[in-house]
Amino acid sequence: MMKMRWLSAAVMLTLYTSSSWAFSIDDVAKQAQSLAGKGYEAPKSNLPSVFRDMKYADYQQIQFNHDKAYWNNLKTPFKLEFYHQGMYFDTPVKINEVTATAVKRIKYSPDYFTFGDVQHDKDTVKDLGFAGFKVLYPINSKDKNDEIVSMLGASYFRVIGAGQVYGLSARGLAIDTALPSGEEFPRFKEFWIERPKPTDKRLTIYALLDSPRATGAYKFVVMPGRDTVVDVQSKIYLRDKVGKLGGAPLTSMFLFGPNQPSPANNYRPELHDSNGLSIHAGNGEWIWRPLNNPKHLAVSSFSMENPQGFGLLQRGRDFSRFEDLDDRYDLRPSAWVTPKGEWGKGSVELVEIPTNDETNDNIVAYWTPDQLPEPGKEMNFKYTITFSRDEDKLHAPDNAWVQQTRRSTGDVKQSNLIRQPDGTIAFVVDFTGAEMKKLPEDTPVTAQTSIGDNGEIVESTVRYNPVTKGWRLVMRVKVKDAKKTTEMRAALVNADQTLSETWSYQLPANE
């Protein structure tokens, strides 16, 4: 068997003809481990100013010529298209094709693109390189290729299934997220994509990650369908110590919703890519954490051992909840991470960042292990990410789940039937579920509730909801210091039987 010999990052990989040769994540890991033992070299931009200084509208004019999609002349159902550099996408990435016998560089050519009104000198871009790539597949119709994967910028990637539109993103790795020292954003600097056979229903992508304090080798197996599933294997190597490492990170956006209504009049009742963090803890507990757009940076940690799963979900898909014909938030997927093997002790961490508009991703969720590897030592993360609009799959089948969280001014009904505000905040939480719908409406359902030191539960009531055939919890809370966050939890029970997941909410400071 011929041994692969890496010449350098700048030299094209040697072609192989041995039938026994096969490319694997170990080949990428050798490069990652070698890089980790060297000083970091920041990527260099070769982008002419006409592209670097362009506005978004100009960048949008640069379109890939669909007739020149990579693998267009092959019978494989997968096709590749590439992103041109421009704006802040100003650093080239290397993209290689892996066949049964060879690895070869996919070279940039301006002929792949149409440039619209963008004036440029062809000689200055002939060796420019790509900013990233996208994968096309006939996911919605047999006679039409639709984009299902986008790899563009840092270590971000977006994935969709049938009938979905792009929303939240996944990332390769998060470093020092929300720490005062500032976040470090690793980037995928090189990709290797296996040429699929005509009958293949999955696509394999390898990636080399690099940053000032970490390197990594990744293998992504994309399995498109009604739910598109990505199987991820990563091998991480630290160059230097980090404050916090985030594995399987997800990035999303939450601007406003019924738990935190828009401060300005808006025809859209809700505006978000995701509205909650769902966690299946190692001890079996299911937790639902509605998202906020806080006035100050907020970080929540859920400590556990060997998590069974977590994800940023878009619960509630009625168009009337969003009313947005352009951006179709009702069609944006949830993303669910299922760990493989035991991840040990650590925390699922949620970061919520203030934002004034929907163009900024302000939500991050990831797994952060208690024990970090020493520089040069390998750390593995293996997991799948499911991109789905079927949230019924993403909670315990025998437990009720939180359908909606609403926040309102707390009040008390007077003898004259007029409601009088009493200085409290009311939370209206609707629980529903297949098993709960089977319960008689006179079932004595009650709530187990708790609140942190900064609040007091003034009243808690549970009543049957005939519309959803579930139960509604109304909890009135008095906050002691509005400048501090207030934590609260609730779950529905019937005697000693737990009926629902745990609703875990943080009321932001200065609300």
Curated annotation (Swiss-Prot):
GO biological process terms held by the UniProt record: beta-glucan biosynthetic process
Gene Ontology CC entries for this record: outer membrane-bounded periplasmic space
Single GO molecular function: carbohydrate binding
One Pfam family, short name: MdoG
Pathway: Glycan metabolism; osmoregulated periplasmic glucan (OPG) biosynthesis
Main location, first listed in the record: periplasm
Signal sequence coordinates: 1-22
The keyword Cytoplasm belongs to this UniProt entry's keyword annotation: no
Keyword set includes Cell cycle: no
Subcellular location: Periplasm
Domain of life: Bacteria
Keywords: Periplasm, Signal
Protein's job: Involved in the biosynthesis of osmoregulated periplasmic glucans (OPGs).
Family: Belongs to the OpgD/OpgG family.
Name the UniProt record assigns to this protein: Glucans biosynthesis protein G
Native species: Shigella boydii serotype 4 (strain Sb227)
Originating gene: mdoG
